[in-house]
């Protein structure tokens, strides 16, 4: 009898097992060891699992290493290698082809539609897109939010929309002219009606530029950023029957909308002022007093004293004698 060593080299290259799992014949004294039925023994299964993995790796490197196995291609052979499932379930697909996805079909179409002279695409390889630094949306700089830099981008967008709108208007105007021509051919208008129509069209044309100018002014008048400005407020607590004035009222710029509430000194309830004024001198009506004769000494370290000049003159608690300026009773 010939031994394994005397056999040809081809028998050594070909594997002595079928890559697709089949049930081995069981001997007479065999018993079910595992809890789950229809599952093979662990040792034989893991051995087959490692062999299948090795086969798939070798077939990807060089198909000549495993001539019985077909070239590894997920579209032709779908073999799931998972130690938790049985080999018979893993290889149940066999040589059946898998359904192509929509992405693959789209990529093939794009490759076929490529224009002559264009560079050859890299075979459907996908790379992650980087965010453009110059993109106004993705830019995180504060400067990109200002109106001056955003005007160019808005102008380009407006130009595109205007061109589309103008093209649509031209088409609709041509259609209207054709319809009017047909109607006029059928029913000639009297000279009075012609004059009235001409005046109406002239009025509409004159009103359109006025509206566009107003819209431009409104868009420019919009404030992008609403910062806070300091104002002078008058407060009143009904529970404590207490009134106080404060120069620390923070309002939204250009409005009297109070941003922060203030607390009463005794009951600590939050209040909004019942009246808000701009911080200005009562005599010269300016934020910084320009009066020749000032009612008191101006301390540059405490600018609110200067802002409140002439407001509490002659009162029991004046700015000069009060150290805390948050609550001026």
From Swiss-Prot:
- An annotated Gene Ontology molecular function: translation repressor activity
Residue spans of biased composition, Basic and acidic residues class? 166-177
> In what tissue types does this protein appear?
Specifically expressed in ovaries but absent in testes.
> If researchers knock out this gene, what phenotype do they report?
Mutants exclusively develop into adult males, due to female-to-male sex reversal. Defects are caused by early oocyte apoptosis mediated b< the p53/tp53 pathway.
Q: Where is the composition biased (Acidic residues)?
A: 149-162
Spell out the Pfam families in the cross-references: Zn_ribbon_3CxxC (PF13695)
Could you tell me where this protein is found in the cell? Cytoplasm, Cytoplasmic ribonucleoprotein granule
Keyword Cytoplasm carried by entry = yes
GO BP of this protein: negative regulation of translation; oogenesis; positive regulation of oogenesis; translation
| Residue spans, zinc finger 3CxxC-type | 231-314
Region Disordered, annotated ranges: 106-132, 146-218
This protein's UniProt keywords: Cytoplasm, Developmental protein, Differentiation, Metal-binding, Oogenesis, RNA-binding, Zinc, Zinc-finger
* Predominant location category: cytoplasm
Q: To which protein family does this belong?
A: Belongs to the ZAR1 family.
Record PANTHER family? ZYGOTE ARREST PROTEIN 1, ZYGOTE ARREST PROTEIN 1-LIKE ISOFORM X1
Q: What is known of its domains?
A: Disordered regions undergo liquid-liquid phase separation (LLPS) for the formation of membraneless compartments that store maternal mRNAs in oocytes. The 3CxxC-type mediates binding to the 3'-UTR of mRNAs.
Q: What is this protein called?
A: Zygote arrest protein 1
Q: Which organism is it from?
A: Danio rerio
Upper lineage is: Eukaryota, Metazoa, Chordata, Craniata, Vertebrata
What is the gene name?
zar1
């Amino acid at each position: 009898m010939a031994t394994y060593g005397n056999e040809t080299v081809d028998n050594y290259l070909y594997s002595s097992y079928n890559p697709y799992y089949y049930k081995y014949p069981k001997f007479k004294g065999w018993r079910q060891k595992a809890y789950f039925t229809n599952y093979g023994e662990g040792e034989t299964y893991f051995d087959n699992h490692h062999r299948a993995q090795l086969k798939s790796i070798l077939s990807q490197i060089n198909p000549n290493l495993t001539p019985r196995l077909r070239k590894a291609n997920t579209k032709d052979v779908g073999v799931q290698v998972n130690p938790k499932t049985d080999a018979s379930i893993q290889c149940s697909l066999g040589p059946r082809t898998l359904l192509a996805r929509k992405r693959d079909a789209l990529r093939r179409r794009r490759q076929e539609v490529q224009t002559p002279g264009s560079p050859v695409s890299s075979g459907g390889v996908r790379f992650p897109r980087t965010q453009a630094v110059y993109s106004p949306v993705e830019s995180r700089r504060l400067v990109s939010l200002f109106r001056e830099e955003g005007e160019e981008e808005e102008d380009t967008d407006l130009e595109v929309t205007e061109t589309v709108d103008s093209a649509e208007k031209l088409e609709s105007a041509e259609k209207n002219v054709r319809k009017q021509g047909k109607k006029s051919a059928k029913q000639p208008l009297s000279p009075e009606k012609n004059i009235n129509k001409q005046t109406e069209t002239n009025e509409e044309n004159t009103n359109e530029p006025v509206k566009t100018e107003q819209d431009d002014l409104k868009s420019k008048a919009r404030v992008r950023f609403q910062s806070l400005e300091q104002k002078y407020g008058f407060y009143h607590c009904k529970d404590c029957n207490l009134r106080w004035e404060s120069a620390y009222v923070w309002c939204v710029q250009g409005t009297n909308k109070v941003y922060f509430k203030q607390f009463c000194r005794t009951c600590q309830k939050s209040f909004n002022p019942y009246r808000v004024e701009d911080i200005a001198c009562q005599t010269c009506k300016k934020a910084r007093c320009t009066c020749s004769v000032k009612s008191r000494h101006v301390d540059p370290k405490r600018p609110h004293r200067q802002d409140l000049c002439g407001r509490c003159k002659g009162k029991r608690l004046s700015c000069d004698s009060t150290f805390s300026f948050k609550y001026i009773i």
